[in-house]
Amino acid sequence: MVVGQAKAAMGKISSAIGERSKRISGAMNEPLRKRKILLVIVCIAMLLDNMLYMVIVPIVPNYLETIRTYKLVYITIPSNGTNGSLLNSTQRAVLERNPNANEDIQIGVLFASKAILQLLSNPFTGTFIDRVGYDIPLLIGLTIMFFSTITFAFGESYAILFAARSLQGLGSAFADTSGIAMIADKYTEESERTQALGIALAFISFGSLVAPPFGGVLYQFAGKWVPFLVLSFVCLLDGILLLMVVTPFASRTRGNTLQGTPIHKLMIDPYIAVVAGALTTCNIPLAFLEPTISNWMKKTMNASEWQMGITWLPAFFPHILGVYITVKLAAKYPNYQWLYGAFGLVIIGVSSCTIPACRNFEELIIPLCALCFGIALVDTALLPTLAFLVDIRYVSVYGSVYAIADISYSVAYALGPIMAGQIVHDLGFVQLNLGMGLVNILYAPALLFLRNVCQMKPSLSERNILLEDGPKGLYDTIIMEERKAAKEPHGTSSGNHSVHAVLSDQEGYSE
């Protein structure tokens, strides 16, 4: 009797759990909700990548100091004779620390190794993403980042830390590119796409700015391995959430996928090249200031350790403000994305030129905030433009075009840690900032080249002119199918079937 009641109760509990699981699964797979969950997953991946990129800033220099190798040196100890003469001597072995003359170079190479490998990997990862979709590369990227973070936590030599840093670059090439491309694919309406990419940029900024104090505090009070284990745990949870939402390894036929445009063809597109150049140019000041501004603050304004530690933290709020303003302007005036980017480049240039004139910490905060505000304008305006260019000129597959965007960022962050210190040593901090500011201001007029492209967004007549050469993007393909259907005797049914076939191809590709 009791056993039967227990079995019945267990059956009811199991049934309730199964029913609840089905409801949760059904809710997560509802299209609009699933799109929002995927945006959260991508934003967490961006946050983790940039936190891992910046969390080592307060940790690595001090840690390398503690593990700096010793070398065995033999010193001669003379012995005096009875009359004061040196009759014999003895040798004693002592441990002597290796000089740290090349420590700055080692740290610079370690910081740059992530961006260098990311730069080298992106041409291949972009093509891979175009072929298999966005979910598998995102999962691969999260997996690589997880193992990279674990390696950072327990690595105890420069070689292991270098390998972990380089491994992170490979993971970023998969996760960053596929994540941004997934957002562009899921959010097809221009204002929604700009808003979603702006949210992702906000997470990138937050990760970069909060990571140094996060890493420094945990490193000081809990040890080197704690901040990396925290990040690896969040990375693991993000990967599990991704597996709950999508089925990356479900069977898919090759015929149901759209073939993306080769990356080399996108690279020589003049419009995409202008956007990529702007993304590189606007990030050069940030990439070159991060490794040099602390020493300059110490020498120029006798800044304290806490001031150098929170140098970039106030800039987070203007960056968010820049994202918000650009999203609102793009929704109301979508034809002027190029103008928002050009204005951002000018702000970056002026801010970079005024940084050397600052003589205290309070003054320095103003140009740094303006610098990050300008970067937000450029990134938020131009990243959606890349997806739009692919939509109207090629096939609506975004892996390769956002691999080009990732390459643009990686160029700046690969050169910064290696070249910035040498430029300051040879030319000076003032000359470095004036040069970076001048480059940004001079590049701003190049975005005029995008003016006509942006004006095509609401112009159906110009899109129809493009369609005379045949369909290129997904939406143009649908329009062409509808035109053909209208000319056929039984156009309605065949036209609907063709349009549904195109849409199902895209859904089969991105799911």
UniProtKB/Swiss-Prot annotation:
Spell out the InterPro entries in the cross-references: MFS, MFS_dom, MFS_trans_sf, MFS_Vesicular_Transporter
One Pfam family linked to the record: MFS_1
Keyword Transmembrane helix part of the UniProt annotation: yes
What top-level branch of life does the organism fall under?
Eukaryota
Give GO BP annotations, semicolon-separated. chemical synaptic transmission
Q: Which GO terms describe its cellular component?
A: AP-1 adaptor complex; AP-2 adaptor complex; terminal bouton
Sorted keywords for this record are:
Glycoprotein, Membrane, Neurotransmitter transport, Transmembrane, Transmembrane helix, Transport
Transmembrane helix is among the record's keywords: yes
Q: Which Gene3D superfamilies match?
A: MFS general substrate transporter like domains
The primary site where this protein sits is membrane
Q: Where is this region: Disordered?
A: 486-511
All ranges on the Lumenal, vesicle side of the membrane: 58-108, 157-165, 219-225, 289-306, 359-363, 422-428
The tissues where this chain's protein is expressed are given as: High expression in the electric lobe of the brain.
Per the record, ranges on the Cytoplasmic side are 1-36, 130-135, 187-197, 247-267, 328-337, 385-400, 450-511
State the Gene Ontology terms under molecular function.
Answer: acetylcholine transmembrane transporter activity
Q: Which CDD domains match?
A: MFS_SLC18A3_VAChT (cd17383)
Residue ranges annotated as transmembrane are 37-57, 109-129, 136-156, 166-186, 198-218, 226-246, 268-288, 307-327, 338-358, 364-384, 401-421, 429-449
State the family named in the UniProt similarity comment for this chain: Belongs to the major facilitator superfamily. Vesicular transporter family.
Q: What is this protein called?
A: Vesicular acetylcholine transporter
